């Protein structure tokens, strides 16, 4: 009869590595009895008193009579018996919970029950089927089992579970699996059961849904839009880009009605397919907005009355400035607005809002007045900040407006004249049909071709009758002009045109009177036509010195003395004829002098008829002499122009007034210096003026016209050439003409080299060199002082200074 036992063996020996496998198919009944599969059910824990007892003793062990050499098997069996009793107690508790009777009915009475009933250690009974070999192997397995139980006593192993989780049904099933029927006759069946059962590991629990959400693998149906209209929409793309006037009108109205152009407002979408249906066209939307605004204003406290007005009238700097320009742009939209509005109430509201905008621009008064006075021109700082004049911008705007108006006026007749030509027909479509702007109209005539306009330089022209010089540099024919002057003097009907600037003309006449050997009657007649005494104080030093030299005096350094001498000479010369003709003192002649015949009539009234006849004869003689001298002067002028042109072509040196750093490389060669000497000698020897001067004239000595009937050369040429050159220009020439130092070490550089090297110039030394050697290079007899040299240096930006031991302070 097969018996099944459940044995738990505790060992107190040290831990050893188990070399046997649990699932061994060749094990016998004894091995199967010892190596039962480990139960997965929780085992009952031993009590605290059992744990603290010695591991080799138990409460059921009775010490022997001192024979310690007894077999160890009996001791091991006694220990296993105690453990089996504990296991039986736990089994009884499990049987109380349920299912103990069922299990006993199904299972036959086995050896485990007898062990549980008897507290004594059981003695194994060997059947006849067992052999000696089997007993030997059983002893070995028992020893291994006892070692395992002893090593297990050191470590408390178990599984703690909550009482509510485990169920009785599961416990019964597990206990059934743990208890295996061991019979020597059915070993192959036991082998199959061990292979099927395996290690009896508990099945892993299913993962909780709270930790990781499960992936929804189900297919979801996606509702797709109907794309049938896309084919038609693609063809209508270009139509949507068109300009819709109604939509633009509604947008401009919303901007003007809501307030300033820069106010942050809600975006309003406009239906492009139906442009007529917009929020501005619906009166209900406007009424709703007005109601919302009224409710907001009613909720505000009464103390904020002033702030309400300010919030209603949005006044910003940008709004005020741009409102001046947006007024004109929105005037042409009023008619379109009236067509779109649905009711009179909405139109009245919009009108009130536009009035509020206008009043908003005008308030507060001072700020708006200040803004209106300003002229706004948009540009960069460098473009706007050109001049400091406050009226510059306003004048510029006036000129721009005037030019625009003139363009508009010019377009009207041009359109009428071009209508007949048929070039610009409004029926054809062309990009050249638009109106032209200022850039296209400039320098073109009415027919559209380039206009060849002659440009006249009116800066130096002081008389209307004077002809401008020809572009190729040729001078007007003076012989023809002189002939016309003589004819005009002979005729009593033609008036004589006289310029306002008469100082140089007086000088020329005085020179002519002083040089020409005429009779005292002729000089008296010529002096009668002389104008009042010129203002010598306005003349330059060169003109004064020239005039003094004409009277026979030596050049003077003092300006006041020269002026006094000239005034006395002029009074002494014109004292005899001054009583004949009366002039307005201090006022220049305005060109309203009488004719030659009127002057003769005045002289006839003061003198006898005989004197008048003699004067007429003298006049005719003077005219003949003037005609002869004019022809001679023209011949000399032609020769002088030829010589000057030849000199200019031969010499490539350009005479410069200013001293620059780059002039150290442009030093004249000896041949150029020789040509300059020859030119200066020819200028000084020639009593007649040269028409073209290679040296620039000073700003004060401008060209003047010869309006009288004199046969002398023009006053402008005589003033620039016959007069002595300026001392400043002479100093510049002398500095440049000084020979260059050719020494190796350059211990004594020239004055020009010192100036170029920014060396300080000692004024006393420089003035001494000019008076002794420098001015002699340019044939100048005058002398200069250190103070005059200082002024010349400062005007040219040259570093200069006096000596330290001098009384003057060092510069």
From Swiss-Prot:
GO MF annotation, one: 5'-flap endonuclease activity
Looking at the record, which segments are called Disordered?
Answer: 36-161, 266-312, 464-498, 579-649, 680-726
Q: How is it modified after translation?
A: Phosphorylated in response to DNA damage.
**Record InterPro entries:** Slx4_ascomycetes, Structure-sp_endonuc_su_Slx4
One GO cellular component term, please give it: Slx1-Slx4 complex
Span-the-membrane segments of this chain are: none
Give the keywords, sorted. DNA damage, DNA recombination, DNA repair, Nucleus, Phosphoprotein
Q: Does the keyword Phosphoprotein apply?
A: yes
Bias (Basic residues) ranges: 90-103
Subunit structure as annotated in this protein's UniProt entry? Forms a heterodimer with slx1.
Q: What is this protein called?
A: Structure-specific endonuclease subunit slx4
Give the species. Aspergillus fumigatus (strain CBS 144.89 / FGSC A1163 / CEA10)
The organism's taxonomy opens as: Eukaryota, Fungi, Dikarya, Ascomycota, Pezizomycotina
């Amino acid at each position: 009869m097969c018996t099944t036992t459940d044995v738990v063996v505790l060992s107190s020996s040290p831990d050893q590595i188990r070399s046997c496998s649990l699932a061994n198919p060749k094990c016998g009944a004894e091995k199967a009895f010892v190596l039962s599969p480990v139960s997965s059910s929780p085992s009952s824990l031993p009590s605290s008193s059992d744990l603290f007892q010695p591991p080799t003793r138990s409460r059921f062990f009775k010490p022997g009579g001192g024979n310690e050499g007894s077999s160890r098997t009996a001791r091991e069996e006694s220990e296993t018996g105690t453990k089996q009793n504990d296991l039986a107690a736990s089994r009884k508790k499990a049987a109380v919970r349920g299912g103990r009777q069922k299990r006993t009915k199904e299972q036959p009475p086995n050896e485990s029950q007898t062990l549980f009933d008897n507290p004594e250690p059981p003695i194994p009974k060997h059947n006849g089927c067992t052999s000696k070999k089997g007993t030997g192997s059983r002893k070995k397995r028992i020893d291994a089992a006892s070692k395992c139980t002893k090593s297990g006593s050191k470590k408390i192993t178990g599984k703690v579970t909550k009482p509510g989780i485990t169920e009785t049904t599961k416990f019964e099933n597990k206990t059934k699996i743990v208890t295996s029927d061991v019979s020597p006759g059915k070993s192959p069946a036991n082998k199959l059961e061990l292979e099927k059962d395996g290690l009896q590991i508990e099945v892993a629990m299913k993962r909780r849904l709270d930790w990781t959400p499960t992936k929804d693998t189900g297919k979801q149906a996606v509702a797709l839009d109907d794309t049938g209209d896309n084919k038609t929409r693609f063809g209508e793309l270009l139509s949507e880009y068109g300009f819709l006037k109604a939509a633009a009108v509604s947008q401009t109205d919303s901007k003007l009605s809501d307030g300033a152009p820069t106010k942050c407002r809600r975006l309003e979408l406009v239906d492009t397919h139906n442009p007529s249906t917009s929020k501005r066209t619906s009166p209900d939307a406007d009424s709703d907005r007005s109601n919302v605004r009224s409710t907001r204003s009613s909720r505000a406290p009464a103390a904020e009355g002033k702030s309400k007005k300010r919030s209603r009238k949005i006044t910003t700097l940008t709004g005020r400035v741009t409102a001046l320009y947006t007024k004109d742009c929105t005037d042409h939209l009023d008619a379109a607005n009236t067509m779109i509005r649905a009711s009179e109430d909405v139109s009245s509201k919009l009108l009130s809002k536009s009035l509020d905008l206008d009043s908003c621009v005008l308030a507060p008064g001072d700020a708006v007045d200040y803004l209106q006075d300003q002229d706004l021109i948009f540009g960069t700082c460098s473009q706007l900040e050109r001049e400091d004049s406050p009226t510059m911008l306003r004048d510029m705007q006036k000129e721009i407006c005037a030019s625009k108006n003139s363009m508009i006026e010019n377009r009207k007749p041009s359109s009428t004249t071009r209508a007949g030509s048929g070039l610009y027909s409004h029926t054809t479509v062309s990009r050249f049909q638009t109106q032209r702007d200022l850039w296209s109209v400039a320098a073109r005539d009415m027919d559209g071709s380039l206009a060849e306009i002659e440009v006249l330089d009116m800066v130096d022209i002081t008389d209307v009758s004077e002809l401008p010089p020809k572009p190729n540099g040729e001078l007007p024919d003076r012989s023809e002009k002189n002939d016309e002057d003589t004819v005009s003097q002979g005729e009593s009907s033609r008036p004589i045109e006289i310029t306002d600037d008469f100082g140089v003309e007086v000088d020329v006449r005085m020179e002519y009177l002083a040089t020409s050997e005429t009779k005292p009657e002729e000089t008296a007649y010529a002096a009668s036509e002389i104008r009042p005494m010129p203002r010598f104080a306005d003349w330059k030093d060169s003109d004064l010195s020239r005039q003094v030299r004409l009277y026979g005096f030596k050049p003077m350094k003092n300006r006041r003395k020269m002026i006094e001498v000239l005034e006395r000479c002029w009074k002494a010369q014109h004292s005899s004829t001054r009583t004949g003709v009366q002039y307005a003192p201090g006022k220049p002649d305005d060109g309203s002098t009488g004719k030659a015949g009127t002057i003769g009539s005045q002289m006839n009234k003061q003198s006898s008829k005989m004197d008048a006849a003699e004067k007429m004869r003298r006049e005719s003689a003077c005219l003949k002499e003037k005609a002869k001298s004019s022809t001679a002067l023209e011949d000399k002028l032609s020769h002088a122009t030829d010589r000057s042109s030849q000199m200019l072509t031969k010499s490539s040196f350009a005479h410069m007034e200013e001293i620059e750093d780059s002039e150290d490389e442009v030093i004249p060669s000896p041949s150029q210096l020789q040509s300059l000497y020859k030119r200066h000698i020819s200028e000084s020897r020639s009593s007649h003026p040269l028409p073209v001067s290679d040296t620039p004239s000073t700003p004060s000595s401008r060209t003047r016209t010869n309006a009288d009937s004199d046969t002398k050369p023009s006053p402008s040429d005589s003033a620039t050439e016959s007069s002595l050159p300026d001392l400043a220009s002479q100093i510049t020439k002398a500095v440049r003409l000084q020979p260059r130092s050719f020494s190796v070490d350059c211990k004594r550089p020239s004055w020009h080299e010192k100036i170029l090297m920014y060396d300080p110039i000692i004024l006393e030394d420089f003035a001494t060199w000019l008076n002794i050697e420098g001015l002699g290079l340019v044939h100048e007899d005058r002398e200069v002082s250190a103070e005059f040299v200082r002024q010349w240096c400062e005007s040219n930006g040259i570093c200069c200074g006096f000596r330290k031991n001098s009384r003057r302070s060092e510069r």
